[in-house]
Amino acid sequence: MKTFPDDFLWGGAVAANQVEGAYLEEGKGLSTSDVQPQGVFGPVVERVAGDSGIKDVAIDFYHRYPEDIKLFAEMGFSCLRVSIAWTRIFPNGDEQQPNEAGLAFYDRLFDELAAHNITPLVTLSHYEMPWGLVKQYGGWGSRQTIGFFERYARTVFARYREKVKLWLTFNEINMSLHAPMTGVGLPETSSKGEVYQAIHHQLVASALAVKACHEIIPDARIGNMLLGGLMYPLTCKPEDVLETLQENRAWQFFGDVQCRGAYPGYMQRFFRDSGIQLEVTDADREALKSTVDFISFSYYMTGCVTADEALNQQARGNILNMVPNPHLASSEWGWQIDPIGLRTLLNVLWDRYQKPLFIVENGLGAKDKPDANGVVQDDYRISYLNDHLVQVREAIDDGVEVMGYTSWGPIDLVSASKAELSKRYGFIYVDRDDSGNGTLARSRKKSFYWYKEVIATKGASLKD
């Protein structure tokens, strides 16, 4: 009977802008997420008095977190990944002094987790930044934003140094290439050069946060967070294989800088070939040497790559412009399901970096419907998660050091890509629909009891 290590962290992951609601309460400022009502790929819509969006209330975690944490504890969670809303701490982003009410909220949240023996894993910036920094400074396009972020990071490290020992800098930092407003606060019309300069500023800020964390909380560990976009060649044609190498490097580059402390040679060539000249100072190069302690990543799907331009044209428009894999089934949202790919990715990252790995997002979004007894019989989710966890166990057997697993959306939340509540991920059902109707009542799905057993048996209950 194969089991997971005794110190393996089990839990779930959420993001402030997808669960908290209370979008202007207690001094919170507007974030980029607040002005993207249709999700990370949607247009920017300036807020006006009296308007509303689904994320303004979301699932009201801001007021209901004690109830939700109690349910997480009932499942046996040893870890909960949350994010701090930067705009609760520095509403506009450029203030000299933080907002005490925002700091106090996260004190209460972390205290509640501690009361249930749940370790917090805290993301500093999860798909949001102060809208004030975008409007007044140009987001991450401005070098000044590095300083604003470092002030924010140092503020929360100092405040929560006794309460939080596991940190992440930027969520899915490589998504800036696909969603520049969400990632770096730049308009969709930005040039490749502008986006990479903003990414450079963010990489420097991430490294400065790592350095600050090590100074302020010596016993803490801080990691990066990548969207694990593993690609396969569509065929064994050498052109497809080379194209796949390049596609994988497009996201691995972020990890290379954050884990190795310098820009890799292949990116230098890419910048030369693309006519991109980054402004990189000696101080930047020195800062980048502060590397992360571990690598965290999300994993939802794999895709295929081909050098055949006609096939590539057909793939335009799906989330990462991937060519479908003919050997895999897809979710309702067209995301291809590939449990073995998770084992492969874990091995790829371990071979590349030799640093501990943490799977901090993995899950199945589906249109759950309660049955006559009000229970969601989500066998499809159980099957999806079971098959992925079996592959995590195999990777651990391969010798990969895996710190833990936090499923995405242990409770239904507003999805990032299209800001839908109908795309449900949770073990816990939340009574609210895409129009904002519902009581917000929480109820346990079938998967709630399944995950509880998996955690209690350290994975022994998984079906091979």
Predicted regions and their residues:
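Active-site region of glycoside hydrolase catalytic domains
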Residues: 1-49, 92-94, 103-464
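Aromatic-lined carbohydrate-binding/catalytic grooves of carbohydrate-active enzymes
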Residues: 75-102, 122
